[in-house]
Amino acid sequence: MLAVLRRPANLYLLLTYLALSAVPFVPMLAGKPLGRPWHVLGVEFVAWVAAWAIFKRPAWFHWLLIPAFLALPAEVYLYTYYGQGISTHHLGIIAETSPKEAMEFLGSTVYLMLGAMLTVLTWMVTSFVTARRTRDLDWNDSSRWVALAALALGAGVWAWGYEFGIAAKPVAPVAAALKKVAAVHLVKAEGKLSVAPSASSAPAAKGVAQASISKADRAVPGVGLTGLKWAPLPRVGRLPVEFDAFANSWPFGLVSRSYDFYKERKHLAALGARNRNFTFHARQARPDAKAEVVVMVIGESSRYDRWSLNGYERETNPLLGKEANLVALSDVITSVSATRLSVPVMISRKPATHSLKEGFAEKSFLTAYKEAGFKTFWLSNQISFGEYDTPVSVFAKEADVIQFLNLGGFTDNSNFDQILLAPLRSAIADQAPKKLVVLHSLGSHWNYSHRYPKQFDRWKPSLYGVDKPAYTNISIKPQLNNSYDSTILYTDWFLANVIGMLKQGDQRTALMYVADHGQTLYDNTCDLAFHGHNTQFEFHVPAFVWYSDLYAARHPLKVAQLRQQRKARLSTENVFHTLLDLGDIRYPGEKLEWSFMHPQFKEHKRYVDSYGWTNYDNATVRGDCREIIDKGKPLKQEK
């Protein structure tokens, strides 16, 4: 064996495989943790054994590594600058980014990337030639068949669990549970405490015992592709590693990521198929030759009462507060406090009470604007794929130009919203005379201290520089709130820059900003934070409209109506209708009474997701968390 390793060709090949396997451990060189490194290492070892056992010699499996070689520069780049490897989101960006956009994004690092790619290609070719020439590393003895048998057995066990599910870990007997979790009476006798179970303890203990099973010990359902009704795999046969360990491994884990990407694309296509043939038959009511730009900014996790524009004592909007043509809307609510559910209601005619249902049979205002002769842009600092993002991406794909610019996700390596400014400038300068630009910002998404540069870290103490703070830890309440307010300060700067761009030149311009939902922030004695709750802090969102002087001269009645309705009861359901009215776009079946910029405007019943569909304007506010509680009976929800 040592003689084989002493030969340079063999050593070069083995070191190549070792280097590829070491890619997931790159973050550890920078002092960053890797989740379950031993699991990843074990999975990689099994994967290499499987490849060698099945193909017998490196020359016959080396070609499988071509995707890994090609992906290596991107993987190292993402780990270096964003602290994460290639994901379905990154694959989506690569698939939808033109070479020109890629060059603009890489900037001065493009030559470094090209050099790295040439180096890797040289490495790939030379290692492949080496694998073809050497026969020293062939697996020829009988141990190969033993390995194949063991792999086949493991694959069979995995297939059984995948198809028929995995049984749950046995629950502790009720008698034992009674001693631990049943309702008890504490009786003080002779200076000691004795425990006596209540009469109703048994059923309660059984329920508690079942509920106490951790997620890792619960039953896992099978996919049921065969239709057979076999018993689930016994718990003892469950593989000792999670499937994520394979996805995080290299180089064979790329297969899993590619498959996830394929599933997301397929899911995206299925959602898009529901409205593929839909049309609004939209047109501009009074078209003219004047160039115009309409910008729609979708905010993230922003709270109405943390904007000084809305009366907050801290000056979080020093720049927007100086804009004479800005009309702040004081009573806008979102129906659901989750981005993937709230944004579709905002950008389409999807009713609030249908927001929990996936997909929608109609397209968004992007298509209506396109039909009316506008070139449309979707510029996003959010994620394109995933459970929480794909429903929004379905609508984003309607745009003529789509750019997802955040390679870092929501981590500490994510981009600030200012990354949207350069592509916005390009969109405004585009030769098309009429343009709609949607900016989907990262706003005040957790972790708050990662949403702004250091110079905006105004209120102290803050979370700035704190590694992985837990928002569930109420002891960081002051830091959490201070950092949150700094996100609003940065949002003010970002939006002021957007407006500043719209003021330049002689185009007719207008902008609408609406946040998708708010945040609860351990308010007073409330022990809740983040979002996904039924609190007024999360339903009441900041919103405003800004217009240029040229816009006001063209549409004085719209501007007058806007100012008149600044205190009207509004919801994100009004956004679609108002944004089309803002662009003077008409279509058959339109509901002008839903546009707060039109004289026909009427307030409508506003529903929010609170113990069913609660009538927001017929509800009480409960406790310091300000839960919205319907005075009547909430409507039943359908999902």
Predicted regions and their residues:
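A long, amphipathic alpha-helix that forms part
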Residues: 44, 48, 280, 422-425, ...
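Acidic helix/loop microenvironments that form the catalytic cleft of cell-wall polysaccharide enzymes
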Residues: 443-447, 515-523, 599-602
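Transmembrane and membrane-interface helices of multi-pass
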Residues: 1-241
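Short glycine/proline-rich turn/loop motifs
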Residues: 345, 469-480, 554-561
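Metal-dependent active-site segment of extracytoplasmic phospho-/sulfohydrolases and closely related
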Residues: 295-296, 487-529, 576-580
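Active-site-proximal alpha/beta segments of enzymes that process anionic O-linked groups
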Residues: 160-468, 571-572, 577-598
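Histidine-centered active-site microenvironments of extracellular/periplasmic hydrolases
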Residues: 311-315, 507-508, 512-556, 592
